[in-house]
């Protein structure tokens, strides 16, 4: 892989004041890991599609499967991942389980992502 010269420093000067600020503000490794794991969840387009459906309404697995033209098993697998990562929540009503967004942060994350990819 070729390295662009413009991306390398021509000087080896260390900026101690900047490094001190970085050291004071950089989150702990566990928080960085957890954040990276959260963003991995958004790396699957099926899960994103499920979240978009849940933006509109609380729905059961049957309705999600029909709306997304997928099997209930496939939807359930993705919902389990979303639920484990606290992006969706569920409630039982009789024989059905209904899913909804866990909170407004989920919508905000998706909307911020959409704004980012639509930038010039």
Please provide the spans of the model-predicted regions.
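N-terminal leader segment of winged-helix/HTH proteins
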Residues: 1-42
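N-terminal helix-turn-helix DNA-binding core of bacterial DNA-binding proteins
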Residues: 27-73, 97-104
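Alpha-helical residues within the helix-turn-helix
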Residues: 66, 77, 83-84
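Beta-hairpin "wing" of winged helix-turn-helix
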Residues: 83-93
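Conserved segment of winged-helix/HTH DNA-binding domains
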Residues: 100-120
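Recognition helix of helix-turn-helix DNA-binding domains
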Residues: 72-80, 92
């Amino acid at each position: 892989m070729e390295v662009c010269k413009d991306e390398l420093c021509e000087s080896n000067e260390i900026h101690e004041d900047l490094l001190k600020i970085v050291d004071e503000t950089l989150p702990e490794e566990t928080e960085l890991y957890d954040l990276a794991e959260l963003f991995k969840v958004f790396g699957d387009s099926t899960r994103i599609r499920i979240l978009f459906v849940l933006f509109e309404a609380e729905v059961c697995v049957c309705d999600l499967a029909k709306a997304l033209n997928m099997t209930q098993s496939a939807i359930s697998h993705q919902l389990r991942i979303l639920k484990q990562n606290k992006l969706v929540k569920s409630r039982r009503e009789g024989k059905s389980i209904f899913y909804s967004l866990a909170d407004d942060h989920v919508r905000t994350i998706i909307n911020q992502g959409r704004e980012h990819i639509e930038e010039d």
